[in-house]
């Protein structure tokens, strides 16, 4: 699917990440037997791993299709570096928010961030020819 529209893959992955975060947050309100076991959270984590692979595929495919042959390696290297720096920054902020808000509300905040990412991806121009 990324060969047809990497922009749509990015959008759909953002929506799926938001759904996973909201599902994980909702587990806190399940009856004790469900929220006391690790399995519902393990399922959400497994789904998030799949969604993360979609985000990575969509991002790299979008960059490769957008860049010309002579700039492709530069764009991918820059994208990887910026992504790594953003992960460090957002990871630090997420840790602080997790201490302040608690896990459930942190997942809600992350869901809104994923929705914002999906909206941003939906506004990207198509680059596939």
Give the positions of each predicted feature.
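Loop-to-transmembrane helix entry/capping segments in MFS-fold secondary transporters
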Residues: 69-79
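A membrane-interface helix-boundary motif in multi-pass transporters
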Residues: 37, 96-114
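Helix-to-loop junctions at the C-terminal end of transmembrane segments
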Residues: 1-11, 98
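Intracellular juxtamembrane helix-capping segments at the cytosolic ends
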Residues: 54-67
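C-terminal transmembrane helical hairpin of 12-TM major facilitator-type secondary transporters
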Residues: 8-55
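A gly/Pro-rich, aromatic-decorated transmembrane alpha-helix motif that marks the paired
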Residues: 85-97
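Multi-pass alpha-helical transporter architecture, strongest
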Residues: 24-28, 109-129
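Transmembrane alpha-helical cores of Major Facilitator Superfamily
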Residues: 15, 46, 77-85
């Amino acid at each position: 699917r990324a060969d047809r529209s990497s922009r749509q893959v990015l959008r759909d992955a953002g929506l799926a990440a938001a759904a996973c975060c909201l599902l994980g947050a909702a587990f806190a309100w399940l009856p004790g037997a469900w929220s006391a076991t690790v399995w519902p959270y393990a399922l959400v984590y497994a789904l998030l791993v799949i969604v993360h692979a979609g985000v990575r595929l969509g991002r790299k495919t979008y960059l490769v299709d957008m860049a010309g042959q002579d700039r492709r390696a530069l764009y991918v290297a820059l994208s990887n570096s910026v992504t790594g720096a953003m992960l460090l920054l957002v990871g630090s902020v997420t840790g602080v928010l997790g201490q302040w808000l608690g896990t459930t509300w942190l997942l809600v905040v992350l869901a809104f961030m994923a929705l914002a990412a999906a909206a941003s991806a939906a506004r990207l121009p198509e680059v596939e020819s």
